[in-house]
């Protein structure tokens, strides 16, 4: 089987990858021929070393050191270690790591190439299916996706360190100048407006620009990146990583209109009238409301406000609410309410800001937390105390002094099979607190009302009603992708949605041009 047939075999196994097909064929040209077995690469002598080589993550800084700053906690692999860990891959005939990745990344291929020291080719394969591999390698919950489904993990040998190798590949590519700005082979006259500069919008912008489309991205913030920039702390994703990618996109000809609030600074209809197609990729920013007495007390804040203030300070911005102490945990007893990754971001941020104590209230137990278990472990190492099976009942003080807590127990399962928390009567107590952070998740804003647009259909949850395969909405030429369609989810899903929407938009533009030519 030749190189092109090899990539067609992968494409046949995963038919919904979308426009990445063309990129895969381009990447194939960089890879030398290898023997094939059942459509997959036959492992050579450099692979299958999981029996003799143990799983070994990059060095993690000691808790007492890392909690003093906002730098990433894991070091970079040295080349020898990256090759060694990649060689543990079993090159299985059915790669469950790939099928459980929302992007269907060609993980076994770039692990093999890394093991062989062929980093340039590994990067070509990695970026063919993933717009931001350096970001996914850092923040994806690999324990729930690729690594959690690694075959050798199931056999007790410990999963391949897929995320760390993915990060290493693209970081090396940036260091060596292999990551180039987009350079379309030909420019096209059509233009697309994208509302939202988060991962979904940026992934779509990248794909469209590669086809020569004129792309303008509109965003409410003063920097692109969305939650990558302002919602995720630097100890998980250092901001220069995001800004480096933003610089590449801008250098490739994507126009950014920042500090632009659609509905206020510019109407949705104006954007729609200016472009041949529009993509809505706003994400979800509305904090899920906590209904409890005293929730409006001073010192009870929203997670996104808290994280944004902290991230702005990391850029050197003047942040009045941080400097005044309103969104600063220094010297305070902090309680964070929630059990997802945002809650983990908040508790670990509070530790670094110098809180005297940090506690996380969650209404279920540790095994039922929706967040990454790796992040829970990191938080525990850094001194966060988890208060399991506990829920807030209310707050005391005009300026918050404490959280009224009710103990819970797990009862009968809900329709999904997950046990429902039940109140234990008479179990109330007060948890002292000077700062309470609500991290209960995010909901969509009412876009039709916010933007004054008629005909844009939404679901009963407030998300934009769109075709999951194409992102088509109820308005002609208007598409939607990411969290604004599926609800609060992972960055990797937003990237996939953005790429699929870009493919659908390309089809729409081509069909429109064909009709106009008739």
Can you name each region flagged by the protein language model?
Residues 110, 135-138, 143-195, 211, ...:
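FAD-binding core/adjacent interface of flavoenzyme oxidoreductases
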Residues 76-96, 119-145:
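Immediate flanking context of iron-sulfur cluster ligation sites
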Residues 346, 484-509:
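A conserved FAD-binding loop/helix module that cradles the flavin
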């Amino acid at each position: 089987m030749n190189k092109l047939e090899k990539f067609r075999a992968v494409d046949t196994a995963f038919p919904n990858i979308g426009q990445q097909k063309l990129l895969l064929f381009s990447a194939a040209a960089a890879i030398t021929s290898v023997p094939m077995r059942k459509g997959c690469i036959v492992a050579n002598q450099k692979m299958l070393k999981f029996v003799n080589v143990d799983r070994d993550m990059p060095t993690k800084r000691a808790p007492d050191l890392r909690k003093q700053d906002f730098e990433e906690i894991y070091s970079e692999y040295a080349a020898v270690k990256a090759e060694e860990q990649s060689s543990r891959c079993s090159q299985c005939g059915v790669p469950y790591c790939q099928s459980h990745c929302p992007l269907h990344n060609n993980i076994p291929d770039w692990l093999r190439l890394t093991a062989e020291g062929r980093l340039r080719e590994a990067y070509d394969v990695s970026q063919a299916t993933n717009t931001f591999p350096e970001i996914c390698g850092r923040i994806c919950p690999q324990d729930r996706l690729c690594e959690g489904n690694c075959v050798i993990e199931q056999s007790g040998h410990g999963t391949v360190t897929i995320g760390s190798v993915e990060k290493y590949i693209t970081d090396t590519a940036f260091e060596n100048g292999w990551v180039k700005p987009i350079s379309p082979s030909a420019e096209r006259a059509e233009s697309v407006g994208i509302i939202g500069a988060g991962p979904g919008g940026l992934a779509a912008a990248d794909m469209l620009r590669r086809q020569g489309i004129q792309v303008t991205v509109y965003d409410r913030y003063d920097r692109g990146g969305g939650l990558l920039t302002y919602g995720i702390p630097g100890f998980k994703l250092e901001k220069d990583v995001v800004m480096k990618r933003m610089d590449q996109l801008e250098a490739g000809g994507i126009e950014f209109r920042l500090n632009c609030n659609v509905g206020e600074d510019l109407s949705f209809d104006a954007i729609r009238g200016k472009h041949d197609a529009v993509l809505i990729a706003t994400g979800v920013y509305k904090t899920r409301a906590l209904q409890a007495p005293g929730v409006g007390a001073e010192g009870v804040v929203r997670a996104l406000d808290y994280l944004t203030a902290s991230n702005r300070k990391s850029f050197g911005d003047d942040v009045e609410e941080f400097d005044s102490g309103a969104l600063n945990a220094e010297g305070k007893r902090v309680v964070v309410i929630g059990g997802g990754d945002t809650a983990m971001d908040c508790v670990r941020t509070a530790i670094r800001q110098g809180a005297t104590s940090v506690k996380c209230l969650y209404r279920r137990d540790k095994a039922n937390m929706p967040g990454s278990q790796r992040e829970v472990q990191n938080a525990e190492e850094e001194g966060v105390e988890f208060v399991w099976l506990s829920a807030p009942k209310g707050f005391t003080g005009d300026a918050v002094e404490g959280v009224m807590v009710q103990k819970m127990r797990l009862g009968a399962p809900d329709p999904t099979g997950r046990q429902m928390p039940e109140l234990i009567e008479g179990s109330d107590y007060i948890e002292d607190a000077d700062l309470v952070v609500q991290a209960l998740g995010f909901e969509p804003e009412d876009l039709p009302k916010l933007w004054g647009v008629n005909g844009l259909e939404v679901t009963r949850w407030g998300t934009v009603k769109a075709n999951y395969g194409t992102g088509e909405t109820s308005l002609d030429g208007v598409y939607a992708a990411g969290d604004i369609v599926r609800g609060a989810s992972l960055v990797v899903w937003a990237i996939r949605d953005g790429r699929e929407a870009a493919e659908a938009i390309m089809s729409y533009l081509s069909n429109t041009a064909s009709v106009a030519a008739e």
